[in-house]
């Protein structure tokens, strides 16, 4: 299955798993709103930023399964097959990720709308990678560890 991040967002839309918010939302409120939502949230209007933020993409089993293109019960099989036959990465000349490229002095990380996840955080952090681990007794788990 070939898919892009945009395809995944559209899949969430079609399956009523995405709530799009057009009214202005302060970036400091994003994490709290995501925690309260049963859907993934797409914030289209963050004052001070020129790009949207989407969050909550992996907060439900249904959304994970939709992203993988399988029913929930088949996630383990799909992951197992992918791990048994990994696909080598390849460079491509054109891709959506290459639509906007900043280099040199044009790079400014403060342009990115990076939320604060907890009141105890020292400030905004780019974090929250997904770790997939397999335990012989309990099976496969996907988690976010900071």
Language-model regions, residue ranges each:
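Extended, highly charged
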Residues: 1-146
């Amino acid at each position: 299955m070939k898919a892009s991040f945009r395809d995944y967002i559209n899949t969430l839309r079609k399956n009523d798993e995405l709530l799009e918010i057009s009214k202005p939302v302060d970036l400091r409120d994003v994490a709290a709103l995501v925690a309260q939502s049963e859907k993934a949230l797409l914030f289209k209007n963050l004052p001070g930023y020129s790009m949207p933020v989407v969050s909550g993409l992996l907060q439900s089993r249904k959304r994970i399964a939709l992203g993988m293109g399988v029913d929930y019960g088949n996630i383990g099989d799909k992951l197992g097959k992918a791990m048994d036959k990994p696909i080598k990465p390849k460079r491509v000349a054109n891709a959506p990720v290459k639509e906007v490229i900043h280099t040199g002095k044009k790079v400014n990380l403060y342009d990115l709308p990076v939320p604060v996840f907890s009141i105890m955080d020292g400030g905004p952090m780019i974090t929250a990678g997904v770790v997939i681990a397999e335990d012989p007794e309990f099976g496969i788990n996907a988690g976010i560890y900071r």
